Amino acid sequence: MKAIWHGGFIYTMLEEGDRTEAVYVEDGVIKGTGSYERLKEKYGSPETEEISLNGAVMFPGFVDSHLHLIGHGEKQLQLDLSALTSKDSILQAAKERERQLPKNDWLIGEGWNENQFETPDYLTKHDLDRLFPDRPVLLKRICRHAIAVNSAALQAAGISRNTPDPDGGVIVKDANGEPTGLLFDKAQDLILKAVPPVSQHYVDEALTAAIKDCWTKGLTGGHSEDLSYYGDVSVPMKAYEKAAAGGKYPFRCHLLVHHEAVDRWEQLEKLSGPYVEFGAMKIFADGALGGRTALLKEPYQDDPSTNGVQVHDDETLGRLIRKAREKGMEVAVHAIGDLAFEKVLNAIEKHPPKNGRHDRLIHAQVLDNELIERAARMPIALDLQPHFVASDFPWVIDRLGKDRMKTAFAWKTLISKGILCAGGSDAPIEPVDPLLGIQSAVLRKSSHEQNGPSYNESECLPVYEAIKLYTEGSAGIIYKEKSRGKIAEGYDADFTVLSGDPFAIDPAQLHLLEIKKTVINGQIVYEKS
């Protein structure tokens, strides 16, 4: 296919403010940029289509650098609790969902967040047992680092007062030693192993739903981690083969491989082509701030009895990174707390990646000046989730204390130190919409407050830097800085077309911009009617 795109504002992202009048695309690759007349004279032919932007604004395709694609699709299919603001509303929604289920199915929901309740108390089995005495119920907290289950689910998993905490996890127990139904991090696996395996059809349906939804948000690709959560690795692999690899639903899928899945993954035939590729080995170093399981150097201010959860001891973390090196892989490590981040840096220093390569540290929410300086000297890149600011403030201030907040969520500082940073959502934990992430990076305001302040305003990013996270950053973090993330000759023809110019509007209106078109490999996959 040959096409000349013109008639709008085309930002190349080669440098701030740089625009071109027209773009010529052939077989999914940009072959020329410049004036419309010059490109028409050089490339115009009966086979060359002319596509007018009708005044719309084109960018290199936005790419989410960290999400869980199949999980995002599940959120479209399952009980979504993320907008509910009380235990009663959650229980009512769960009861309504139960009416749609076969008799023996588990009831599974996604996204509860006690910080949205008037009284921020966790869900427990006592809440759930009142309405669900017999059917197993599993409700995932929004961070996916905690779950609330009822007694039937505990019984199905064989969890009792005598069950010890697994390494890297916590089974919360009451004063009498009885499980409360709340489980954190690796303890969740005890429940998840008892849940009947999902079908191939279910995973296929979830992935397709996710890709289609991402198109509507202007996303042309995503770096996803979901190969270890749906039974055998072959199940999600087949889903990616059916949906994306053959081009049925074009989407640039860069897949991380969880360390628990990597050996099985190696045994399977690898998918290839322009839409599916594999990247680093995924490891979790800690939990999340919402459940106080992110690993901190000092205890939580609002609960001095804990400083979080270390998912792997130092020796195991080092062994896992060494395993990745033996397989010729980099690592992508979830590290939210400062102590987790420090331990990951220590392990990477002992087992560095090959020259010219870098490891990925995901989230990097709570740091200190020493860690930031150290990270800037090391072969690492950071996956940032700007919308965490909108979700976590203001409650996170009481959780961490004001002193730690000075270098928390420090996106601008990290970028200023020359660290390669990319932008993502962590969907389904946060909304997948990149415009919400860009707006959060620019404004740093809470979505829980009307007309609230900008938190740590000195860390607000200019609009250009925020968009770079989702273009140049997402390309560079997977070594594609010379083929994606810019509109220039030789780059992939992946475009996000907006209804308005993000550089010319009030940043508070960024999320109101419409996606006019999403273009992948030169093909229009989504167009607003």
UniProtKB/Swiss-Prot annotation:
InterPro entries: Amidohydro_3, Metal-dep_hydrolase_composite, Metal_Hydrolase, YtcJ-like. Keywords: Hydrolase. Its EC number is 3.5.-.-. Pfam families: Amidohydro_3. The gene is ytcJ. It comes from the Bacteria. This is Putative amidohydrolase YtcJ. One of its GO terms (molecular function) is hydrolase activity, acting on carbon-nitrogen (but not peptide) bonds. It is an enzyme of class 3 (hydrolase). It comes from Bacillus subtilis (strain 168). Belongs to the metallo-dependent hydrolases superfamily.
